[in-house]
Amino acid sequence: MENVPNVYFNPVFIEPTFKHSLLSVYKHRLIVLFEVFVVFILIYVFFRSELNMFFMPKRKIPDPIDRLRRANLACEDDKLMIYGLPWITTQTSALSINSKPIVYKDCAKLLRSINGSQPVSLNDVLRR
């Protein structure tokens, strides 16, 4: 065998001679404030509607059925009639889904079964 010279590597450590002044918060307050400002602007741009909904008072949406609560049902022969609607001053015929007047044999007996001898309001019928 041949004589092969051995080579040994020794680690060399170089000590840093500069300080990490970029990481100091005190010297770069304006940069930090600018970043915070940019973050708030981005939050406002992307979440503007959510922020408006959070800080604005909730609007009360009127229930369309509230206008019908004062209307009452009555029978005229075998026809079911509605009176007391806010937009109609006269008594009108109650209509079914297919827009035909509701005609029921023993209509008065049906209304008595709902509310006894008291007048039957639309609210009584809608709650059932």
Swiss-Prot record:
GO terms for cellular component: membrane; viral envelope; virion membrane. Pfam families: Pox_L5 (PF04872). The keyword Transmembrane helix applies. Most cysteines are linked by disulfide bonds. They are created by the viral disulfide bond formation pathway, a poxvirus-specific redox pathway that operates on the cytoplasmic side of the MV membranes. Unglycosylated because produced in viral factories instead of the classic ER -Golgi route. It is a single-pass type III membrane protein. Keywords: Disulfide bond, Fusion of virus membrane with host cell membrane, Fusion of virus membrane with host membrane, Late protein, Membrane, Signal-anchor, Transmembrane, Transmembrane helix, Viral envelope protein, Viral penetration into host cytoplasm, Virion, Virus entry into host cell. It is found in: Virion membrane. Residues 1-30 are intravirion. Disulfide bonds join C75-C107. InterPro entries: Poxvirus_L5. GO terms for biological process: fusion of virus membrane with host plasma membrane; symbiont entry into host cell. Induction: Expressed in the late phase of the viral replicative cycle. Belongs to the orthopoxvirus OPG099 family. Interacts with OPG086. Component of the entry fusion complex (EFC) composed of OPG053, OPG076, OPG086, OPG094, OPG095, OPG099, OPG107, OPG143, OPG104J5, OPG147 and OPG155. Except for OPG095 and OPG053, each of the EFC proteins is required for assembly or stability of the complex. This is Entry-fusion complex protein OPG094. The lineage of its organism: Viruses, Varidnaviria, Bamfordvirae, Nucleocytoviricota, Pokkesviricetes.
